[in-house]
Amino acid sequence: MPSTYNPVRGVLLLVGSLLARFGLVERERVRRATDLSWPRVVTGLARMSKSTADVAMVGLALGPTAIAGVGFAAPFWELVFALGGGVAGGTIGMVSQRYGADADEELAVTVTTSAVVVLGLTLPLTAAYWAGPGLLVDLVGTGAEAVEYGTRYLRVVALGVPFAALNLIGSRTLVGADDAWTPMLLRAGGAVVNIVLNAVFVFGFGLGVVGAAMGTVIANVLVTVGFAVGLARGRLPVIGAFPVRIPVSRPFLDRELGRDLAETGAPLVGANLARTGAQFPRLFIVGLFGPGVVSAYVVALRVRALLDTPNWGLSLASSSLVGQALGDGDEAEATVWAETVLRLSVGVYLVVAATLLPFSRGIARLFVSDPAVLPLVTVFVAVACASVAFRGVDGGSTGPLRASGDTRWPFYAQLAGMYLFALPLAYLGHVTALGELALYASLVVETAVPAAVTYYRFRSGTWRVVSRSYRPDAALDD
C-alpha cells in the first residue's frame, strides 16, 4: 500500500488521532482502517464527480431540458447499483470470512457464484432498457423533449448494465481480501476515462446524450476487463499482484454458497431497492412544488451523495475487518473493529458536515446562478450538509451487520426511513401549509431514521450470533 500523503487519507487519520487522544480508538487500528478505506473514498469521489461532470457537459451542450432527460433516466441506471450492490454486499462478508480463514477454494467459488447471480439479475434490465426505454422514462418524466432525451440515453446506457454490476463484485471481492487500493485504481481510472470520452463524444462529435451514454458504457467495459484479467491471472501489469486469484478452470456455481449469498444479499438488495425505488415517487412529489423546488432538491441530493463518499470506504472497511475476525472465530476482535470504525465514521461525518455547512451558498453557486432560485438552493444544500451527519452512524453500524450476514435490519431501516417517514412527510408539505419545510424535514429523517435502527441492532450484539451460521466451517458442515 503506497504511503504517499494525500488529503483523503490525511483527514481520516486526523479525525482518528483526535479520537485516540480521548481514548475512544486505538491509533494502529485507525491506521489500518484508514489504509483500507481511503482508496474506496477516492473511488466514490471520482464516481460522484463523474456524474456531476456528465450532467454539466450535457447541459452545456444541449441545455437544461437535456439535463432533465438524463435525470429522468438516472433512477433506472441506479437500479443496477441497487441490485449489484446488494449482491456485492453479501459477497464482501463471505469473501472476508473465507479470506480470514484461508479458505481459498470456497472464496473463489463465492466470487464466481456472485458473478453468475448478479448477471442473472441485471441482464433482464439490459433487455428492458434496450427494448422499451421510452415507456419506462415516460412513467416518471414530463415534457416530450426531455422524455426523448432520456429515452435515447437509457437505450444506449443499457448496454453497460451488466458490466457495471460485475464491477461491483470485483471491487467488493478485493476489499474483502483487504485490498482497497486496486479497486480504486481500476474504478477511479474508469471514471477519468469516462469523463474524457464524454467530452470527446459530447463536444467533439456532437453526440449529446448518446455520447454521454457511450462514454459510460465503454468505461464500464474496460473496468470489467481489468477486474476479470486481474482476478483470473492474480495480477495486472502496472497495478501488480491481486490478493486473491480466481482460477477459470473450476466449477463456477455452488448451491450452498449461493443459498448463503441469497440469504445475506437479498436483504441488502431490498434495502438498496427501497432507497433507489423511492426516487420515482420522490421525483413525482417534489414535482408538485414546481420546477424551482425540483432543481433545488436535485442539487441537494447530488451534494449529499458527494458528501456521503466516506461510507464508500469506512463501511466496507468495517465489513472486511469484522468479517476477517469472525472468519477466524474471534468475536471479541470483531467487536473492537466494529466499534473502532463506527466511531471513526461518526467523527469523519461530523467534521465534513460542520466544515461545509457554512459554505452552503458558495456550493449552491456551483450549480445555479439565477438569483431567484439561489436562496432556495442554498437552504436545501445546508439541509443536505446537516442530514449527511447521520450517515456516519448508519454506515458504521451497517458494516458489521453486513459482515456477519445480519443484513435484514439495514433493509428494515431503509424501508422505515424512506417509506414511513420521508415520503409521507414530503407529501404533507404539498397538502398543508408546511411547504418546503416538510421537504427539509424529509431530507433529515431519510438519514436519521435508518441511523437509529441500524445502531440499535448493532448495539444489541445479535449480529455476532447470526454470523455463526455463515462462517466457513458452518458452510462446509451444511
Enumerate the predicted regions with their spans.
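Generic alpha-helical transmembrane segments of integral inner-membrane proteins
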Residues: V41, L45, S49, A53, ...
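Short alpha-helical transmembrane segments in multi-pass integral membrane proteins
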Residues: M1-S37, V95-G160, L207-G265, V322-S387, ...
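Interfacial/gating helices of multi-pass transporter permease domains
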Residues: V58-E78, E145-Y149, V209-M214, D260-T264, ...
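Hydrophobic/aromatic residues within transmembrane alpha-helices of membrane transport systems
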Residues: V42, A46, D54-V58, V70, ...
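Small-residue-rich hydrophobic transmembrane alpha-helices
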Residues: I67-A127, A164-G176, A180-P183, V294-A354, ...
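Short runs within selected transmembrane alpha-helices of multi-pass transporters and secretion channels
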Residues: F81, G85, Y153-V175, P183-A191, ...
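N-terminal transmembrane alpha-helices
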Residues: L24-A61, P75-G90, M94, L119-T126, ...
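Transmembrane helical elements of multi-pass membrane transporters/channels
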Residues: D35-V58, V156, A219-V223, F227, ...
